[in-house]
């Protein structure tokens, strides 16, 4: 009896466990309250209209991006970074870029939809402290890219790029391209090589090593990191041409054992390596064959004909014309060349492309233009011609016009005064300049 009472007491003291819920259960229709609120306040209409407008705008701007522009254009007589509608080029597809390369650069080469920023590229310029390289660096910096200059300063000058030293997007490395270098980049402009007879004849073995081993190293870098590679070759690959004007399909007439062969054959070999990497390793490559170029920042005593004539006229020395003065050359202003290089890099054609001004001058005519510009009383002095000096040189730029939409804009009489102004400042403003003038060449 007692045990029954005890058990009943325990039953009374321990009530049945009730179901426990941390939060009260809400009916299912509570989940649609936000939708009902949006409908009541008509906010859904505004959201849908906004999405429709954004989609329409993006579609319109995407359709207009079927062009491959150079984001900035140059007013060659006023400066860099000028925006121009003429810089937008129709993209004629020759070979589609690799998926790896396009994934790296994104839409950096085309028009950017409204509200989206252009992707900043990491670009290396070998020989970027030199004459042409420094002008190219100016354009790339104006475009907003991160630029790395690689130069051994054999012919380059720090003064050419000093104005970028405080820019966080600029980096300069003292390095010789005959030695390998590891960098993470999207594009490689390979300009490193002595380009004047005085410099490449000074050390011909070093010149051909720069052309061959240096190009090999830069192509290897492009292969490893998936960068696009642009080789600056030269009109010297045509040698003393038997075809005039020269087209890209002409194979040339080069002396392989002459005093200029270290440069001529070196560039021909560099083109071979570039195409072998393109065909064998699927490297994105571009090849430019550059004709005679002039402008500010040229070396004063580098032995090239324009710089020699200008320096001699400023120093009141006779203008030295070699041979009978009937040899012909074509001269392009440096801003025209830089524009062509950038269009080639951003385009979809491998090349090679002739980049030069088809306006042809004899050496005697050039000397007279320099006389008119600097000193009408300057004398002209004739001397024996140099070895292996080509008799004629004129580019056929039909291919560049059709596929790149490029042609030079600056005439010789327009660009020469800008070069004279720069030379005048350096010749008379720097007392350390050597007053002697090296022997001229029609390079």
From Swiss-Prot:
Transmembrane segments: 44-64
Catalysed transformations (reactions): UDP-alpha-D-glucuronate + H(+) = UDP-alpha-D-xylose + CO2
Pfam families reported in the protein's UniProt record: GDP_Man_Dehyd (PF16363)
EC number: 4.1.1.35
Membrane topology: Single-pass type II membrane protein
Cofactor(s) this protein cannot do without: NAD(+)
Superkingdom assignment: Eukaryota
Residue positions of the active site: 263
GO cellular component: Golgi cisterna membrane
Keywords associated with the record: Acetylation, Decarboxylase, Golgi apparatus, Lyase, Membrane, NAD, Signal-anchor, Transmembrane, Transmembrane helix
Subcellular location: Golgi apparatus, Golgi stack membrane
MF-aspect GO terms: NAD+ binding; UDP-glucuronate decarboxylase activity
PANTHER family per UniProt: UDP-GLUCURONIC ACID DECARBOXYLASE 1 (PTHR43078:SF6), UDP-GLUCURONIC ACID DECARBOXYLASE-RELATED (PTHR43078)
Family recorded in the similarity comment: Belongs to the NAD(P)-dependent epimerase/dehydratase family. UDP-glucuronic acid decarboxylase subfamily.
Protein name: UDP-glucuronic acid decarboxylase 4
């Amino acid at each position: 009896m007692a045990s029954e009472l005890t058990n009943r007491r325990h039953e009374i003291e321990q009530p049945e466990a009730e179901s426990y819920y941390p939060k009260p259960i809400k009916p299912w229709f509570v989940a649609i309250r936000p939708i009902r609120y949006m409908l009541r306040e008509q906010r859904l209409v505004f959201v849908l209209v906004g999405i429709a407008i954004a989609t329409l705008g993006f579609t319109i701007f995407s359709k207009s991006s079927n062009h491959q522009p150079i984001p900035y254009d140059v007013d060659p007589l006023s400066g860099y970074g000028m925006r121009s509608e003429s810089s937008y080029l129709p993209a004629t597809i020759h070979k589609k870029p690799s998926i790896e390369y396009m994934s790296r650069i994104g839409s950096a080469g085309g028009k950017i939809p409204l509200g989206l920023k252009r992707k900043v590229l990491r670009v290396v310029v070998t020989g970027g402290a030199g004459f042409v390289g420094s002008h190219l660096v100016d354009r790339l910096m104006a475009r907003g890219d991160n630029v790395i200059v690689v130069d051994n300063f054999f012919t380059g000058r720090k003064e050419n790029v000093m104005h970028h030293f405080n820019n966080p997007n600029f980096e300069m490395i003292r390095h010789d391209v005959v030695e390998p270098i590891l960098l993470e980049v999207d594009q490689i402009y390979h300009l490193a090589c002595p380009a004047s007879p005085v410099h490449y004849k000074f050390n011909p073995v070093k010149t051909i090593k720069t052309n061959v081993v240096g190009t090999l190293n830069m192509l290897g870098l492009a292969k490893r990191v998936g960068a696009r590679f642009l080789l600056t070759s030269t009109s010297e690959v045509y040698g003393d041409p038997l075809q005039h004007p020269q087209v890209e399909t002409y194979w040339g007439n080069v002396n392989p054992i002459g005093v200029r062969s270290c440069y001529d054959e070196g560039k021909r070999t560099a083109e071979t390596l570039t195409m072998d990497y393109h065909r064998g390793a699927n490297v994105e490559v571009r090849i430019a064959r550059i004709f005679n170029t002039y402008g500010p920042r040229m070396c004063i005593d580098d032995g090239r004909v324009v710089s020699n004539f200008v320096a001699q006229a400023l120093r009141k020395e006779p203008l030295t014309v070699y041979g009978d003065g009937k040899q012909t050359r074509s001269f392009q202003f440096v801003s025209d060349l830089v524009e062509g290089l950038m269009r080639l890099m951003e385009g979809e054609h491998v090349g090679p492309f002739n980049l030069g001004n088809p306006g042809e001058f004899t050496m005697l005519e050039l000397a007279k233009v320099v006389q008119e510009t600097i000193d009408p009383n300057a004398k002209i002095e004739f001397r024996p011609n140099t070895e292996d000096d080509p008799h004629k040189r004129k580019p056929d730029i039909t291919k560049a016009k059709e596929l790149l939409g490029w042609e030079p804009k600056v005439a010789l009489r327009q660009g020469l005064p800008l070069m004279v102004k720069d030379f005048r400042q350096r010749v008379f403003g720097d007392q350390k300049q050597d007053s002697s003038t090296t022997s001229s060449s029609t390079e």
